[in-house]
Amino acid sequence: MFITNEHVGDRSRMEDWRIRGYDPLTPPDLLQHEYPLTPESQKIIVEGRNAACDILNGKDRRLIGPCSIHDPQAALDYCERLYQASEKHKGELLIVMRAYLEKPRTTVGWKGLINDPDIDGTFHINKGLRIARKLFVQLTSKLPIAGEMLDTISPQFLSDLFSVGAIGARTTESQLHRELASGYHSQLDSKTVPMVLWVLPLTPLRAASHPHHFLSVTKPGVVAIVGTDGNQDCFVILRGGKKGTNYDAKSVQETQEELIKSKVVTEMKPGPRIMVDCSHGNSNKDHRNQPKVAQVVAEQVAGGDKSICGLMIESNINDGRQDVPPKEQGGKDALKYGVSITDACIGWETTEEVLEVLANAVKTRRSL
């Protein structure tokens, strides 16, 4: 129930005169009780976390590979396809489904399934959280999933379902998000959930490895001061940028040297800590270039590179992207099935081809 602020627009008020009102938020523990983890989900999540950490720490020689979701049914369809691929390549690839439900925005636009689940500007966030948790419980009955952390509150509703967490490119320089990464943890065991940090230099990654204190909420929804231990299982993603692409061997080597210089990689922690984003700047924002990026990285892996822990691919059932039609033209009901409404993605057939290339690269590296 939305509680309207009767003083909105009244500049004589000391506070909240720009606030239209409030909608009470469902407490995290209530939502977790409503959609609890199943034994199957718990097993897959923990195994995914442990495997990801083993890869980062050099104990597992596979590669790890994690677009925003707007259609839960299509997400389940995609998950089933990805599960079949993961079974095929499980000896070489740890496949983690990228299940991002919130979309960080540089300006404005649809902010994701949690923020606006009906894709019509109604912002039924409580509904979005319920859809999100129900969907994640279903997805994790098949595969481990990766999620992006945009604030310090939503993880309390969903983080127990993630095997890999991400702090996005727009937020790695934010002190609050570094603090969040330092305490991003498993609710199921004592192992820290691996965290992705997207940018160079490596200051955010070093900061996340240290203890911090920050404001958040508890499971019952009470505001609290959170103290963290620090996260030793962080890794960096190379996504390209204003200076060009950075998936080539020279860029990877320079990043590895920075990781060693920053003591993120040491003799005691020699595992690979570099993931390559095949999309965004590395694809020059053309999704059709993602397989080309993957091929170049696969060649590095096949040649014996041990600093690359994985790749990130923006993939969907069908390729490309689409805009949400105006309401008078059907709105979200007129959307094409399995096509992204945010970043453009490669389709399923191309995804299968890329996974095959990566799996073969791992096999070649093992034979060296």
From Swiss-Prot:
One of its GO terms (cellular component) is cytoplasm. Inhibited by phenyalanine. Transmembrane segments: none annotated. Pathway: Metabolic intermediate biosynthesis; chorismate biosynthesis; chorismate from D-erythrose 4-phosphate and phosphoenolpyruvate: step 1/7. It catalyses: D-erythrose 4-phosphate + phosphoenolpyruvate + H2O = 7-phospho-2-dehydro-3-deoxy-D-arabino-heptonate + phosphate. Stereospecific condensation of phosphoenolpyruvate (PEP) and D-erythrose-4-phosphate (E4P) giving rise to 3-deoxy-D-arabino-heptulosonate-7-phosphate (DAHP). Belongs to the class-I DAHP synthase family. This is Phospho-2-dehydro-3-deoxyheptonate aldolase, phenylalanine-inhibited. The gene is ARO3.
